[in-house]
Amino acid sequence: MSLQFNQRSLGKSSIKITPIGLGAWQFSEGKNFNNLIWKSIDSETTNEIISQAVKAGINWIDTAEYYGKGASERGVSRGLQAANLGDNDVKIATKWWPLLRFAKNIPKSISKRIKALSPYSIDLYQIHQPFSFSSVEKQMKNMVKIANLNLIKSIGVSNFTL
């Protein structure tokens, strides 16, 4: 069954997303650091969840570098490929994990995110939370540089506001 969602603009970007997205924390194939809270799931189940979410009308998936050390992002890519979905069919949001890291690490991290999610584009790249060895201002400056290189479509923050 497909629900009819009115799509909304993602922040100030031209990207349109449904009001409900699919969270991909569990798509980490046993590499999830936090199995005490909930268990990660296998590839077959991940593929089915992604397929059913898109059939239901959801057009974006939220994942992060920190979810299974990139395994969630790879699972999202495989699930989208298994469902024969193209880059424009689903929007992808992922996040940089800044804890105990410096803003100068962002370019290296985005290269890994791009590889993990290939062949799909990153529609939204976010700072996952505000705690870092670098100020949020320095982190955002690096995010803007990456956006200006057209490696990602938009930038933002998660779990805090600017």
Language-model regions, residue ranges each:
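Glycine/proline-rich, positively charged
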Residues: 33, 38, 100-162
